[in-house]
Amino acid sequence: MTATTQADRYISFSGIDCDGNAKIVLERVVALVALPEYANCFWDRFLIRLAEADKVGARKADELCLACSNTYYIEELFEAAGDEMGLAALRRLEDECC
């Protein structure tokens, strides 16, 4: 997609890097939950599920599904951390892919 063309998932996913968008969001999540102030049981389980996302035969959800199905929790995490870049990446993921 060019900078002047708005991606519209309702027309086509062509040209939208949903896996890349999810990876950006998930990398920010992993970095934040590694900090003691954001770590908790939910994120511990989330990280286990994220590790399983790479195992095609064993996974229940891939990275995109995992990110899209937890947007509310991820948004809460980014807001608590003041992570504006994370929030922008999450918005893009939601708008283009989820």
Curated annotation (Swiss-Prot):
This protein's record includes keyword Metal-binding: no
GO biological process: nitrogen fixation
Membrane spanning stretches: none
Pfam family of the protein (one): CowN
UniProt keyword Ligase present: no
Keywords: Nitrogen fixation
InterPro entries referenced in this protein's UniProt entry, alphabetically: CowN
Family membership noted in the UniProt record: Belongs to the CowN family.
Function: Is required to sustain N(2)-dependent growth in the presence of low levels of carbon monoxide (CO). Probably acts by protecting the N(2) fixation ability of the nitrogenase complex, which is inactivated in the presence of CO.
NCBIfam families: N2Fix_CO_CowN
Record-given protein name: N(2)-fixation sustaining protein CowN
Organism, as annotated: Paramagnetospirillum magneticum (strain ATCC 700264 / AMB-1) (Magnetospirillum magneticum)
Gene: cowN
